[in-house]
Each structure stands twice: as C-alpha cells, then as structure tokens.
Amino acid sequence: MDLARRGGAAGADDEGEIERHEPAPEDMESDPAAAREKELELERVQSWREQVTLRGVVAALLIGFMYSVIVMKIALTTGLVPTLNVSAALMAFLALRGWTRVLERLGVAHRPFTRQENCVIETCAVACYTIAFGGGFGSTLLGLDKKTYELAGASPANVPGSYKDPGFGWMAGFVAAISFAGLLSLIPLRKVLVIDYKLTYPSGTATAVLINGFHTKQGDKNARMQVRGFLKYFGLSFVWSFFQWFYTGGEVCGFVQFPTFGLKAWKQTFFFDFSLTYVGAGMICSHLVNISTLLGAILSWGILWPLISKQKGEWYPANIPESSMKSLYGYKAFLCIALIMGDGTYHFFKVFGVTVKSLHQRLSRKRATNRVANGGDEMAALDDLQRDEIFSDGSFPAWAAYAGYAALTVVSAVIIPHMFRQVKWYYVIVAYVLAPLLGFANSYGTGLTDINMAYNYGKIALFIFAAWAGRDNGVIAGLAGGTLVKQLVMASADLMHDFKTGHLTMTSPRSLLVAQFIGTAMGCVVAPLTFLLFYNAFDIGNPTGYWKAPYGLIYRNMAILGVEGFSVLPRHCLALSAGFFAFAFVFSVARDVLPRKYARFVPLPMAMAVPFLVGGSFAIDMCVGSLAVFVWEKVNRKEAVFMVPAVASGLICGDGIWTFPSSILALAKIKPPICMKFTPGS
C-alpha cells in the first residue's frame, strides 16, 4: 500500500505513501509559502539544458535503483510505503555535494552544484522508483499471478486460466504504455494550477523548502552532520541485516521471529522483528500513523481473529485451511477492504467537494484577485516575479502535448489488448478519454489538500471494468483497467507536485519534464527487473510467510467482488464489513469536524487497515522508530529536525539494500548456515 502524498492526514488510499515528519517552520531559515532562504538573492539561473546533466542522470539512476529495491521490499512485505521524496532529495544533495568535494580536493575543475540540478535529480529519481509501487507490482499486477489466483479459491468469477504469470517483457511494456501519457495530459494547464490559482501542493512546497535550505551556508554546515549520520546508520543497518541472515536457515527462523513478548503474543504476531526498514519508516511517519497501525493490530490480531476463529465449523467450514478465502482469511481480507473503502469514500467526497467549491469561488472572482500582494516585501515580490518568469518561459507547446497524448492513446489501445485478451480496445479508449478530466480534478484537489485520490479512482475503475467485462473476463480486465486509470491520473498529479517544487526552486519546467521522462523510462526497466529478482528468490505472496504481499490478494478479491457482488463473502462477513466501512467513514469525518485538540487523537482508518492482514510486528517496529524521534525531540529538538531524515534514510537504505545481495544468494541456492528458533520450555 502506498499511502498518497499528504501533509495533514494519512491514508485516503491504500497504495500510496505515509505522511512524514516535516521540519518545523521556526527551525528553517525560509518562509514555507515562498520557499525562499534569507541568504538567497536574485540569481542567474542556468538554462534548462544546463540543469539536466550527465552526472545528475547517473546519480538519479543509482538513487532510483536503490529506492526501487527498498520500495519493492516494503510493497511485497506489508505494502505500507512511506513517503521517500525528502529522503531522495537528501540523497541527491549528498551524492552530488560529495562528488564535487572530491573533485575540489583533487584540483579538478567542475561545474557548480545548484539547487536547480538538485531538484532535477530528485524529480528523476522519484519518477524512477515511483514505478515500483505505482505500477502495481505489489498489488494489481501481483494479483494476476497463478499463486494469487489459487489463494482466491474457487468461485464463478475466478475462472480457470484467469491469471498471467510475471514476465519482464509484458510487465515492462505494460507500465511503459500506461506511465508516459499521464505526464502529457495536464501540461497545458500547469501555469493555471501553479501560478494563477497559486495551489500550495504541500508536499512539493516542503521538498522545495528542503532543497533551498541545502544550498545555503547553514544548510551546507548541516549537510556535513547529515552525511555522517546517514553513513553511520546505513553501515549499522547493513551490517545488522547481514548478521541476521546467518540465523535464518529454515522456516520461521532468526531474529525476525524473536518472541519479544512471549510465545503466546508471538503467535498473534506481537513481537519486535528487528526490521530496521520499518524502524526508519516509523521515524519518517507521524506518531499518529504509527499508533494507528498498532491499534489496528490490537483490534484485529488481539481481539477479532481469536473471536472469529472460535466460530470455525459454524461461520465457515472447519475442513479447509485458514488461508482460504472461504475461511478466516476471507474475513481478514474483506474487513481490511471495508476499512480502506470507508476511508477512501469519505476522502473522495471531501476532495470532490473542496475542489468544486474552490473552482466555483475562483470562477466568480476577477482574474486579478488571484494575485496576492506580498505585504510590501519588495524582495519577496521580486523573487515571485523571477519565479513566475522562469516558470512561464519554460513552456512546452500545447499542441505537442495533445498530439503526444493522442499517439500514446492509439499505441496503448493496440498494445494492451494484445497483452490481456480480456481488455478490449474500447476499454482503453474510454480510460484515456476520461483520464484528463479525472487528472485535473485530482491534481487540483491534491494542490489544495495534499491528498492524491488516484488510487481511489483506480479502485472505482477496477469495479467498473470488472462488472463491464463479465464473469469470464472480469477479474483480469478489472485488475488491468484499474491499474491503467490509476497510473494515468497519478502521473499528472505527481508532475504538478514537481512543477510546484520547480517553481519555488526556480527550476525550468522543461528540465523537470525531461527528468520525469528519463526517470519514468528508467523505472519501466528497473522496477520489473527488481520485482522479478524478488519473485524468483523469495516466496512472494505466502500469507503465512515473511513476503506476504497482501495487496495482490486484496485487489484480486475486489475484482471478484465487482463481478459476483456480495455473494462471494463468507457468512456474516457482509454485516461485519458494513460495520467497519461505517467505522472508517465516521472516524474520517470526526478528524475533520472535531476541534484540532481532539481530532489529532482520532486514529487513521487507513493505517489501521494494514495490520489486519500482515500482523502486528511491523507496527511495533514503527512505534519503536516513533519513540526514538519522540525522545530525540525532547533531548534536542533543533538537531532532531534536520537529523531525523538522514538517520531514518540510513536505516531504511542499509536494510533495504541488503535485500539485493540476499536475493542473489537465494537464487544461487546459498542458504544461511544456522536456524535460530524458539520453542516452549519443557
């Protein structure tokens, strides 16, 4: 699950990114609204061609590959992917600043490293690794494979042969076909959204503040501490993961199965598994997200599943395995889906209402009122004028965007039905015709609320295409069609985020668009290769193993539900699902209507949903990370503000990168020499 980019609340959708800790405004030497450092003055900005450099592309490829491995690991274990944009911007700065420092010491002439180049590298790297989770490798595409087909069990919609096993050719071709068109759909409206409407795009603004802060004297001083912190915890995390590997030579072995709170709690997945990836993720996420995941684990594994399991033989047959969708696992999956859909439904209507209201207000005003005065701050006014001029000069012909979008529509309408015979060419045409309208609504809403609704549009499309295609073709058509719509809508919103970052860092839109295309092209190759490496090396999709990949089965069951309706649900599951849908909807409403001092204690239904399938161990890991940040902020808040992202990135990257050599060892049939297992005393 990759919770979408958001600043205030986490989780309107299940595949997106988790909210992060952002630097407190009082600790930054910048105004977040303008992202302008006091030390920055009007400057000569390089042309867009000079902003896209060979060293930058190489750095983006390396960062994109590293984060693709990390994101893929998270997507195939819990599916809860944290927002890594700030971490990627930090890595881009550290890589290029380190490179230029080495050249300086060697006496080699080099071009200066600017914030514009930093922004381009971050954009390119993020575009690369976004394909790893946005492309559906841990959800919809995984839901197409034979193992997930078998786990879904026998049902009229889950017809024999309704699966497509992973392969590099069709996967790379499919994500390439659906990833580029979204970048073109809203280019003609970029000035309207960023300059005329002055949409904030909070995540894009936060990234710009960070990048601008790097390129100051104080930022350079802080960067040295961040480099040391990152390298220290990267090394610690990598060595610890390497050490743990020696003790995992069998089933249910190693520190990842350490019964921290006793064997009884361990059986209910309550233990600390020493995963530094999720400790780092917990440091990036807000305290509320982490506590919400723990509450979800307690509610599900501590209360619900033990109670429902006692109904074996009455609510569901006693002679089928618990992993069957007709057994306990069916309740786990559909109650999780109910929480996701309840939270997503509320946020869909919320963002739709906010968007319509804001557009109506803007259309009723004169255009001149859209330009806000700077309160007499002449320097700020000059900065804004320079930003607007740079952003306007880097134009991209509207006719070229329209022509490119039309050409990609035709290509996709030809290619995708060849990959999936269940997807008709007119399904693709309908998706491409509706995508610009949905993309504008989503991009506008994201600019106001920082909530990316692409995953909700994708789920709606999944149900529509599944029902439209009918029983024999519905599952495949729903999974492929939902991925298509989601990616088209998400790409345009992500590009607007990057344009906002570029506007505030005085980066040319042309260089950002080029970076997006380069990064997307790299991601279309890197993501399938990374996925296939993991898929062949590990037992992906095993409900009782480490690599649970829960969202593959969730999305397949959504498609089955779209074809068959509620008849597919186990006994009493519909009533329970309706209750949890209402629970999620009411809690989401409460977060918006209650006073701030009370609303901040209302748990997030989306974050609560994840442990329903994957267990509570990762929630404990994330709470450990949250506790570390809490203590650090109490001891030295100023240091914690700029060191937490570096330390968290080091923990995530070290543990995540170890997955790459461990998968190579697994493919080479080299097994760990020791199995450390815990059993009750005699």
Curated annotation (Swiss-Prot):
Tissue expression notes:
Expressed in roots of young maize seedlings. Not detected in leaves of iron-sufficient plants, but accumulates in roots and leaves of iron-deficient plants.
**UniProt entry tagged with the keyword Transmembrane helix:** yes
Q: What triggers or suppresses the expression of this protein?
A: Induced upon iron deficiency, but no effect of copper or zinc starvation.
Q: What gene makes this protein?
A: YS1
Q: Where is this region: Disordered?
A: 1-36
Tell me a Gene Ontology molecular-function term this record carries: iron-nicotianamine transmembrane transporter activity
Role = Involved in Fe(3+) uptake. Acts as a proton-coupled symporter for phytosiderophore- and nicotianamine-chelated metals. Capable of transporting either Fe(2+)-nicotianamine or Fe(3+)-phytosiderophore. May transport iron, zinc, nickel, copper and, at a lower rate, manganese and cadmium.
Originating species: Zea mays
Q: Which GO terms describe its cellular component?
A: plasma membrane
Q: What is this protein called?
A: Iron-phytosiderophore transporter yellow stripe 1
UniProt cross-references to Pfam families, sorted A to Z: OPT
Give the stretches traversing the membrane: 56-76, 79-99, 124-144, 167-187, 236-256, 288-308, 334-354, 396-416, 428-448, 460-480, 514-534, 549-569, 574-594, 612-632, 640-660
